A protein has these predicted regions:
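A short SAM/SAH-binding and catalytic strip from SAM-dependent methyltransferases
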Residues: 30, 38-54
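Conserved Class I S-adenosyl-L-methionine
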Residues: 105-176
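Conserved SAM-binding strand-loop segment of SAM-dependent methyltransferases
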Residues: 18-29
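Conserved SAM-binding loop
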Residues: 10-11
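Conserved hydrophobic residues forming the short capping helix/wall of the S-adenosyl-L-methionine
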Residues: 14
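Conserved beta-strand signature within the Rossmann-like core of class I S-adenosyl-L-methionine
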Residues: 61-75
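Short alpha-helix
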Residues: 84-99, 103-105
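Conserved SAM/SAH-binding beta-strand->alpha-helix loop
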Residues: 3-5
Length: 176
């Protein structure tokens, strides 16, 4: 990752869990070359298929796990706006076309957003919504659930389908 703050949280959580086999690296993934290839790599909502495969081929000696969105709509829009990012189905089609063997698993996960107040919810939809219209307060309130927690009294649920692609770095052709 390139975020020092995010990596500090990861390091802290790994230390607290006693996970000595996790190493957080702050670098540019596409240019770094480890002295020893990683046993495994995990890419969660990260990268286009070709660039991910090139990074795996250069840096990994074992399996790579690619977590991709399995849904086609933007999760924080008040309308059913299509998501613009690459998704699970497209990544599988690209791997098949490249003749890279893989297996998959699909699952659902809650990917919602906690919110501190109704005005925060309105700002959130204004910033991340894709409809191009000002957010409608009644529509927003209809989508929120109350949590009973003082710090985040509202939650915008967003249960989404995800897909995990598992492949072996040794199966990635040099031509990619």
């Amino acid at each position: 990752d390139t975020s020092a703050a995010a990596l500090a949280v990861l390091r802290e959580n790994a230390a607290r869990a006693g996970a000595s086999n996790i190493r957080a690296v702050q670098d540019d993934l596409f240019f770094m070359r480890p002295k020893v290839r990683y046993d495994a790599m995990v890419f969660c909502f990260f990268g286009q298929t070709g660039e991910t495969l090139r990074a795996v081929r250069a840096q990994c000696a074992g399996r790579a796990f690619l977590i991709k969105r399995g849904h086609a709509e933007h999760r924080f829009s008040l309308t059913n706006s299509p998501a613009s990012r690459l998704n699970f189905q497209r990544a599988c089609a690209e791997l098949t076309a490249l003749k890279v063997p893989f297996f998959t698993e699909t699952f659902s996960a809650e990917m919602g957003q906690p919110l501190r107040s109704l005005p925060d919810a309105e700002r959130f939809f204004a910033q991340f919504g894709t409809s191009g219209h000002p957010p409608d307060t009644a529509q927003i309130q209809a989508r929120l659930t109350k949590t009973g927690m003082p710090e985040f009294p509202y939650f915008l649920p967003a249960k989404r389908m995800l897909g995990m692609i598992v492949l072996d770095a040794r199966d990635i052709p040099d031509s990619i």
